């Protein structure tokens, strides 16, 4: 390998390190949900398995319709799972409509300091308790 090729490899390594250092930190590598954790690179939601980049549903946010590279990344229905800590400090305000059809369930402790209020009404016009009717496959 000549010196010019070695220089290009070193520059490429610096560029890759610069790009990935913006997304991850030292804590992300060793944390519970980090690179080596349950949702890391080798986990069911990692790069090569399940819903990862190489999976049938991977790259879903980059295209218009269908599955894979043609998947739509805007509106959908299904389960949303959040694991880990979600620290929120300060005031969070949501203006506009937040349509939720289905059930919202919290599992575990939800610690909040101060006052938490949720006000609104269901105006989806579906006429069913969970929005999709009693024949829906997933009622939680």
From Swiss-Prot:
Keywords assigned: Repeat, Signal
Any one biological process term the GO annotation gives: chorion-containing eggshell formation
Domain of life where this protein originates: Eukaryota
TM helices/strands, residue ranges: none
GO cellular component: egg chorion
Range of residues in the leader sequence: 1-21
Database matches in InterPro entries: Chorion (IPR002635)
GO MF annotations, alphabetized: structural constituent of egg chorion
Chain's role: This protein is one of many from the eggshell of the gypsy moth.
Family stated for the protein in its record: Belongs to the chorion protein family.
Protein name per UniProt: Chorion class A protein Ld2/Ld41
């Amino acid at each position: 390998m000549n010196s010019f090729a070695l220089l290009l490899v070193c520059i490429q390594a610096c560029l890759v390190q610069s790009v990935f250092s913006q997304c991850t930190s030292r804590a992300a590598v060793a944390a519970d949900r980090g690179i080596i954790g349950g949702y890391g690179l080798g986990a069911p939601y990692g790069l090569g398995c399940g819903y990862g980049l190489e999976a049938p549903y991977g790259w879903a946010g980059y295209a218009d319709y269908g599955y894979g590279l043609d998947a739509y990344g805007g509106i959908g229905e299904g389960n949303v799972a959040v694991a880990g800590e979600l620290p929120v400090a300060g005031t969070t305000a949501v203006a506009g409509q937040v349509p939720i059809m289905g059930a919202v369930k919290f599992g575990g402790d939800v610690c909040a300091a101060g006052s938490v209020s949720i006000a609104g009404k269901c105006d989806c016009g579906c006429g069913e308790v969970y929005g999709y009717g009693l024949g829906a496959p997933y009622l939680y």
